[in-house]
Each structure stands twice: as C-alpha cells, then as structure tokens.
Amino acid sequence: MEFRPAKPTFYEDRTTLEEEYSGAHGVRRELRESLSELLEDVKYGKAIHIVAVKTAVRGMMESILRNPDGAMWLRLMKDKNGYTHYHHVDTSALAVAMGRHLGFSSGEISNLGLGALLSNIGTANLPSDLLMSSNQLSEEEISLVRRHVEAAVALLTKTPGVAKQVIDIIACRHEWFDGGGYPNRLQGPAIPVFAR
C-alpha cells in the first residue's frame, strides 16, 4: 500500500505564521492538559472519556491544516517539567503535519494525531522510575515495558469512539519495517500504513 492516498487532498496555507502562532500555543496547552487528565484516569482505573482528547487533537489538526508553521515552531520550545506530555504532543503534531503533507483526509489526519498522542498510554501504570531509568534494563524489565502495547490496545479497544486506525497505530508503533520490532515482529506491508 502506498503512503499517499489515491486522490490526495491538497492543503494551502490560509494564515501566516504570526497569525497561527498564538492560536497554536493555546491548542498545544489544551492538548497537553487533556492528555494529562486522560493519563490520570488510566492510572487510577477510571473510565476513559476520549471526547476531550479527540476535540483537542481536532483543534491542533485544524491549526496545522491552516498553517503548520505555528505548531512546528512550538515544538522547538522546551519545558523541563512535563517532557513526556510535550513529547507526545510534539509527536502528534508531527504526525498531523505529515498527514497534511501526504494529502490524507481530515478524518485520517485526526486519527493519525490521536494515535500518536496516545501511543504510550499503556505505560500509565508502569513505575515512573522504570520509565525514566538511565540504566540498562534487565530482560524482565524490558518485557514489562514492552507489555504497554498490549495494555494500550486492550484499554482503547473497549473505549467507545476510538477508531480502528488509532488502535492499529498504537498496536504497531514499535514494529520495524525489517521485522525486528515488537510485539509481533511484523514486516513491511504487514504493518498498517498509519503505524509506519
């Protein structure tokens, strides 16, 4: 399967960087806050309310569809606190910008952004010292960390309103084109396009 759709959508910048930058800043903050709330819910075993996160992703997508420069400039800003959340927001912004560049539909781009944002949701219940460790992990620790994919897929599969494309992104985000990834060692075209 090709990366570009058969009939790509072409997007033109509708705003300047200056016009888009301040709006993109608010969208980024909203996205980070909604992700934080969702991760707290996961951590404490509460029901997941995906609507707020989807709304925030849609706001980011609309900003990037108008002009991706604002969101891309914001990626360059660093925050010592909340690195992980900003990393996921940045990854989501890059996925949305790539979807725009490749000409995907707005629905596909929204799924790309949501999948990238939630890509590590399965780590919410792992010990933070394990996730932040600078030491080499033991085989047992590696196995524990790798289970986050299955945990995320199980959680999101039972969450209403999460598209199959989003779950595919999360299920296959650690698969490598050469088959060296995990959890299923998928190769090449066996990896869904949106997870590549």
Regions found by a protein language model. Give the residues of each.
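Alpha-helical phosphate/pyrophosphate-handling elements in metalloenzyme active cores
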Residues: 81-112, 151, 185-190
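Non-catalytic interface/linker regions that flank or bridge core catalytic/transmembrane domains
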Residues: 1-78, 82-83
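Proline-centered turn/helix-capping motifs that create local helix->coil transitions or kinks
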Residues: 62-69, 122, 160-168
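Short alpha-helical scaffolding segments that buttress acidic/His motifs in well-ordered protein cores
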Residues: 57-61, 71-75, 95, 112-116, ...
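His-Asp-centered metal-binding catalytic motifs of divalent-metal-dependent phosphohydrolases/nucleases
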Residues: 91, 109-135, 152, 168-181
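Histidine/acidic-rich helix-loop-helix segments that form or flank divalent-metal centers
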Residues: 116, 156-196
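Signal-transmission/dimerization alpha-helices at domain junctions
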Residues: 97-101, 124, 155-159
